[in-house]
């Protein structure tokens, strides 16, 4: 049994553990308040951009970061702009190398997303707007797009 926060490594079993989660950056801009807080006849246009980044940090640990930018505007004004960078450090050990990247870019963000969603909801509500609940994100498709983009960026080798 692991003691004192150590990771248990019995029998080379696969290990996937969340070591920590953290809020790295949060910005909420409400540039046209209080005018932006008035009732509206139609829903604002919401634009959401997300990026997943990951870097190894020490042996078998990965820092996975979700970056979101959420903008809401009506036809004339920006209503709000939220930028959030939220991360987690994950311990991944005794897992085949071919499974590491999907784990880091799909499962890790999937575990972080509910916290990101709650922070965005709280920020918009604290800014005077109804809470914005972001729909679930398909991290599999984002990962596939990332792989496709990386393959396009690789120079072709000619003999």
UniProtKB/Swiss-Prot annotation:
Gene that this sequence comes from: secB
Secretion signal span: none
Keyword terms, alphabetized: Chaperone, Cytoplasm, Protein transport, Translocation, Transport
Protein purpose: One of the proteins required for the normal export of preproteins out of the cell cytoplasm. It is a molecular chaperone that binds to a subset of precursor proteins, maintaining them in a translocation-competent state. It also specifically binds to its receptor SecA.
Major location category of this protein: cytoplasm
Source domain of life: Bacteria
Protein name: Protein-export protein SecB
One of the GO biological process terms: protein transport
Family affiliation: Belongs to the SecB family.
A GO term for molecular function: unfolded protein binding
């Amino acid at each position: 049994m692991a003691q004192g926060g150590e990771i248990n490594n019995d029998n080379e079993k696969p290990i996937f553990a969340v070591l920590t989660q953290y809020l790295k950056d949060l910005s909420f801009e409400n540039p046209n308040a209080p005018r932006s807080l008035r009732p509206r006849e139609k829903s604002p246009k919401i634009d959401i951009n997300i990026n997943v980044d990951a870097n190894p940090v020490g042996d078998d640990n990965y820092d996975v970061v979700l970056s979101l930018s959420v903008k809401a505007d009506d036809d004339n004004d920006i209503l709000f702009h939220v930028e959030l960078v939220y991360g987690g450090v994950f311990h991944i050990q005794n897992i085949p190398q071919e499974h590491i990247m999907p784990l880091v870019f799909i499962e890790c963000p999937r575990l972080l997303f509910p916290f990101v969603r709650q922070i965005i909801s709280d920020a918009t509500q604290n800014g005077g707007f109804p809470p914005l609940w972001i729909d679930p994100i398909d991290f599999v498709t984002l990962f596939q797009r990332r792989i496709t983009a990386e393959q396009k960026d690789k120079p072709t080798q000619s003999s």
